[in-house]
């Protein structure tokens, strides 16, 4: 349930390739310095590049070890719950704060998509409108039709 919301991911990000590479384990005093994943900008004609990184937290019985993400709006630091995912554009610097007790284990991977960040932002906002309109089936249906049309056109 928490680990992967298929409808949300397919609607907003339109993934065409997901790579789950490894898991990390952090114990007391472990951390991961702020860094940017070593992927180059995506050429228009080649979709083998990864657009997003993700980290899925497997345990939550530890202290510290916040997932840190530096965005254009500022830095975010959040302790992820078990099963919670942090999904972010790979161009954003990120890291893990110092674990003060317990064991932090997470799965690391990357995802590519056929659409741009800007297009994904539009689909995200349409998704939010659709979720707010679930009681009004007519509006919900119209929003879903627009989402599906845009996904089809943008994924070409």
What name fits each language-model region?
Residues 1-85, 91, 97-156:
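Fe(II)/2-oxoglutarate oxygenase catalytic core
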